Amino acid sequence: MVPWLAYTKSKTGDTLCWSTNGGELLYWATSTHEGENGHWFSEEDAQNKPELVANGHRDFYRANYYLPVKEREAALKKQAFENIRANPKDVLKNWLSNWGRLIFGFPRSYQHEELIMLVLVGVNAPILLLILVACGIGLKHWRTFPLEIVLLFGVTFIYLGGTSLLPGLPRYTVVIWPWLGLGVAAVLSCHLRLELK
């Protein structure tokens, strides 16, 4: 941790700088050009993918991406906030699309969907249904749960909320499936009874 913070301080001059690509992620998350839905693209894609070139990303990248780190971050964040002010409804659609990418891996801008998406839907949809059922039960009976479970759900939803603001991938949610599983098991074991006759 300390070597990383020392490295980022040497690049940015900021003491607690954890990342130098937040501006880039925010730029793509708020891009509302026709056919785009907040999906992240690499520097190479921005300059070579015909649809992105047509939307002006190549020109923007050439003018701003190769600036020193702090200036690049400032330029990307400035454009992202301009995108939000200019088109808040489409940025909201991008955010909703990002939830789909976090859980199921789609939709993605200008890319063909792959068969692996069916696997993600087949696996994650039942898990998501269990989570929603557990949340409904949990909200109704939240005072009956141990504080640890309430805190676990709180931390999990803070993580999900923050992650949903930037372009997402299913791998970003893999780390919290065990936390959610524990919370769901706690809720369902206390308040759901199945009887076989």
Predicted regions and their residues:
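Transmembrane-helix signature of polytopic, lipid-linked glycan biosynthesis machinery
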Residues: 2-6, 138, 155-170
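Membrane-proximal stem/loop segments at transmembrane-domain junctions that anchor or position
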Residues: 15-97
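Membrane-interface anchor segments at the N-terminal boundary of transmembrane helices
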Residues: 75-76, 82-152
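Membrane-interface junctions at the ends of membrane-embedded or membrane-associated helices
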Residues: 136-146, 184-197
